[in-house]
Structures are given as structure tokens and as C-alpha cells.
Amino acid sequence: MCGIAGFIAGHGAANAAALAPMLARIAHRGPDGQGTFVEGPAALGHCRLAIIDLAGGAQPLYSEDKNLVVVFNGEIYNYRALTAELTALGHTFATRTDTEVLLLSLIHI
């Protein structure tokens, strides 16, 4: 399983340095990579355990227009069927991950 961490700062901008000890604490859950997102009061971090799309599944994952960002710890078992549905609706995929299926599904809603 991957590991995710995050927080919303109560006042002002999030301190990116505050994510480091959180990610260090869960690093054993995701030895294959680490990524962060910090903007305004929001901070998200991800420790990756590569299972699907070993080369292209880095997180956080951003929408094409950069308006949405997601970190995900889980597995969508029917992601291939959902990929086909979303492709038929005109969505294009940059990765082969179930995380991108989640992101594009949220955009589609």
C-alpha cells in the first residue's frame, strides 16, 4: 500500500517543510517514489508503491489544466472498464494508472 499525508493550514499558507516528517514516517509504505503538492493552505504528500503503470504513476497527479490535484492510496479493480468508458466520452489518458481514472472520473462528474 502507498502512503498519503496532508493538511490544511489554519491560517495562511501551508508550510511545505511540515510534510517532510509526515512522509518520512510513512516512507516504508511507498519505497518507489515520493511527491508533494503545496499551494495556498493545502499540502499533500504521497509515498508510492508501484503496482500499476510502474514507470508513469507518479503522484500527486494533476489534471491537464492543473485545476485539480489528487493523491490516491487504493486500487480500482475495474479501472480498465472505466478507462474504456472515459475514452469513449472523449477523455485522453497520459498514464495507465487507476489514479488517473479516479481523477478523470471526478472531472467528468
Predicted ranges, named:
Residues 1-107:
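N-terminus-centric sequence/structural signature that marks the extreme N-terminus
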